[in-house]
Amino acid sequence: MTEQTVTEQIASAKTFSLNLRDDGVGVITMDVAGESMNVLKAAFADEIKALLDEIRSNKNIKGLGIISGKADSFIAGADITMLDGCKTAQEATDIAAMGQQMFGQLEALNIPLIAAIHGPCLGGGLELAMACHGRVATDDGKTVLGLPEVQLGLLPGSGGTQRLPKMVGLQKALDMMLTGKQLRAVQAKKAGLVDAVVPKSILLEAAVKMALAGKPDRSKAVKLPFVGQLLEFTSIGRGILFSQATKQTLLK
């Protein structure tokens, strides 16, 4: 088999597969061909659109879970070569807008979509997970969640800056986005970023159970200590937070 043939097979391979279980939960498996870890690429847009069309048209699907086909990686982020290939700011903006649109469609699904996370869930991977209606993560040391774009001189471009503060509060969200700090699964659960932490052996079943239970109730605000409430829910407090964030950004 020639190198060209292998390249062509990788290019034509599907990244997302949908398997409908007997209990009515559809399991979406993401497995990027030719990559040791899953990364997000603009080239997946048409495949994701077709997948969403298939899901919407199948009335037998009661819920969804999305899991990685890689052994020790959920989604490590956006494809760096794709970002490096941007010649203009508009090209980068277009990629971010595409991500926002796709994740917005995931969030708008009328059936529960649960992310089953094992391994690195970073950058665009976390943005995708936050667009899901629930998140289950393994207690494995390989599982970390974060938005490390700042380490590349970037900010999250596909909804992370809007969704993260709603889940963990503005103060922690700014800290994560401006430092690239990554959270272990237990830390992420304590912060409100994931709903459950389970052993890897029952990850998929835990996600399926959550999907069958319906969309989690997100009406309750993030629980914050008194000082945190002053900082986040008063104009003076938010001014202090943004002032600190500005100073931190200028130090980069």
Cite the ranges covered by each PLM segment.
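Conserved CoA-thioester-binding segment of acyl-CoA-metabolizing enzymes
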Residues: 1-67, 104
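Intrinsically disordered, low-complexity segments enriched in small/flexible residues
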Residues: 2-13, 42-46, 52, 172-174, ...
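Glycine-rich beta-to-alpha active-site loop
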Residues: 100, 105-152, 156
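Hydrophobic/aromatic ligand-binding patch that stacks against planar heteroaromatic rings
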Residues: 105, 128, 163-164, 175-176, ...
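Well-ordered beta-strand positions
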Residues: 134, 175, 179-181, 196
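Hydrophobic, secondary-structure "cap" segments at the distal end of domains
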Residues: 161-171
